[in-house]
Every structure is written in C-alpha cells, then in structure tokens.
Swiss-Prot record:
It comes from Escherichia coli (strain K12). Tetramer of two alpha and two beta subunits. The keyword Lyase applies. Iron-sulfur cluster binds at residues 71, 190, 277. Induction: Induced by tartrate, via TtdR. This is L(+)-tartrate dehydratase subunit alpha. GO terms for cellular component: catalytic complex; cytosol.
Length: 303
C-alpha cells in the first residue's frame, strides 16, 4: 500500500500525463483518421473536393507546427475508461480526470465549452456539473487503466438522434433511421463524418453504444458477421449520397460506419446515431500500475 505522500505524487504524475495527452489530441488527429482522410483525398475527383481535402491537411500540419488546436471547437471532454479493479489509483481517478481537463484547458489551450444548465454560465474551465463526462467499465483482476479521451464538438454532436422502434420495423427501420439522420443533418457536421450506430433496447443504451462506436479504430468491424455486413452496406449507401467534404458534394460522405449492439427486449429495437467530424479528435492512453503508459492512438506523436 502507498503512503499518503507517495500516493499524492502518483496522483500528480497521472494528472500531468492525462492533461498532456488531452492537450495533444486537440492538435493531432489519431493515426487512423489521418490515414482515412488521405485515402478519401486521393480518391476524390471533384475539383472543389480536392481543394477542401488539401485545406484540411494544410490545417492539420499548421496545428502541429503551431501547437494549436486543429479546430477552434475543442468540444466537451468525455472519458471512456476501462480500468482494472486492482489499478492503484482507481479511487482517485475521477478527480484526476477532472483536474487533468482543467490543466489541459490552459496548456492547449482549449476553448471553454462547459456551460452550467439553467444558470447559463460558462465555467471557463471545461469542467462543471457532470463534466467531464466519464463512462466506466471495471475489469476484474486487472491493474491497468485504458483511458479513451473524446472531444465532442458542437457541430458533430448536433446530428445525434435516438429512437425506439417497433420490432416489426426490423433492421430496415434501423437503416431508414440512419439514412434519414445522415442525409438531412450530416451536411452541417463538417463531413466526411464517422457514423456510430447503437442498437439495443432503449434510447439511453443505444445512445451510449453509438458514442462508443465512433471511438473504435476506423475500418474495424463488428464481431458478428451480419452486423459487419450491415456496417459495410451502410457505408456504401451513405457514400452514394455524395455529401462530400464540408457538405459541398464529392465522392464520399463518411469515413466509416461502426455498429455497437447489445441484446434487446423482444418488444423494442432501440437505435441511435452519433457522428464524428473530419477532425475526429479522440485518443487512447493505456496506463499501467507503475504509471508507465502507452499512446495507442497516436503512434506518430510523442507526449
């Protein structure tokens, strides 16, 4: 067991690690996003689309060179944490994440995006009631912490929708729901977008799953072959809409479609859609019990 002084040192160290990582992902896209954008850029045939993709890559390089956020909307910070039951700072992790956000806000700097409901006052720290939002998965007999950081920008959050379908609507109803939302709303979400689809029982379970879906590496597939096929068919169909980069038409509309699912009630099909914009800022940090860490999402960047 750690002494109080040693524990405080460990808390300070992990806070600094997470703060630096959060600040870093505001300026650098994860490897898979950069690779996918390059693929779409090379495949684009419209002159306007080519110009926009060129501007996107110029923007990404300037963000790195100037060490400034790649988009002025650095989002509301969310954490999706898979932590072992034996991780030594499990009890302190919630407060560590909050303090890390406040420190990253100054380091990056990050735009102030936490407005208290009803008071309508911006806290100026990117923290507040329930913010940063943290989703927990506790892993038995494990002493690591995998921390996924996501910057939920306003534009890419606006298309988010969730609905409960009658079972008679079937998977055709799921497809219709996805197409209705992306075709009408994604144009203003800084496309090409990454589409997350959650399928479960209720609006809240489907919504959480849809958000988790856009945290997966682009191009990864659902373990169920039928779901994986639906991911590919949705991606192909949405790209035929020709929304194009920044909604000005082009060869593609999406960077990918990911589905996350959970067993449902026989009487309902809960479905939700979440989107990530082209500047999809998320990162995965694996922290070991001794506080050594691995940057799993940005292997071309150093903390």
């Amino acid at each position: 067991m750690m002494s109080e002084s040693n524990k405080q040192q460990a808390v300070n160290k992990l806070t600094e690690i997470v703060a630096n990582f959060t600040a870093m992902i505001s300026t650098r896209m994860p490897d898979d996003v950069v690779d996918k954008l390059k693929q779409l850029k090379d495949a684009e045939t419209s002159s306007m689309g080519k110009i926009i993709y060129h501007t996107m890559f110029d923007n990404m390089q300037k963000a790195i060179d100037l060490n400034r956020p790649a988009c002025q909307d650095t989002g509301e910070i969310m954490f999706f944490v898979k932590v072992g039951s034996r991780f030594p700072l499990l009890g302190e992790l919630q407060s560590i994440l909050k303090q890390a956000v406040e420190e990253a806000t100054v380091k990056a700097p990050l735009r102030h995006n936490a407005v208290e409901i009803f008071d309508e006052v911006n806290t100026g720290k990117n923290t507040g009631s329930g913010v940063p939002w943290v989703t927990w998965d506790i892993i038995p007999d494990n002493d690591d912490a995998e921390i996924e950081v996501y910057m939920a920008g306003g534009g890419c959050t606006l298309p988010g929708r969730s609905k409960v379908l009658m079972p008679s609507e079937g998977y055709e109803g799921v497809v219709k729901f996805v197409f209705e939302n992306i075709s009408t709303l994604a144009v203003n979400a800084c496309p090409p977008v990454l589409v997350g689809v959650g399928i479960a029982t209720s609006v809240e379970t489907a919504a959480v799953l849809s958000r988790k879906a856009i945290l997966r590496p682009i191009g990864s597939r659902h373990p169920n072959p039928k779901a994986a096929e639906l991911e590919l068919r949705l991606e192909e169909g949405l790209n035929r809409l020709g929304i194009g980069p920044q909604g000005l038409t082009g060869n593609s509309s999406v960077m990918g479609v990911h589905i996350e699912s959970a067993a449902r009630h026989p009487s309902t099909i809960g479905v939700a859609v979440s989107t990530g914009c082209w500047a999809h800022r998320r990162g995965t940090l694996l922290v070991h019990a001794d506080l050594t860490f691995e940057n799993l999402s940005h292997t071309r960047s150093a903390l």
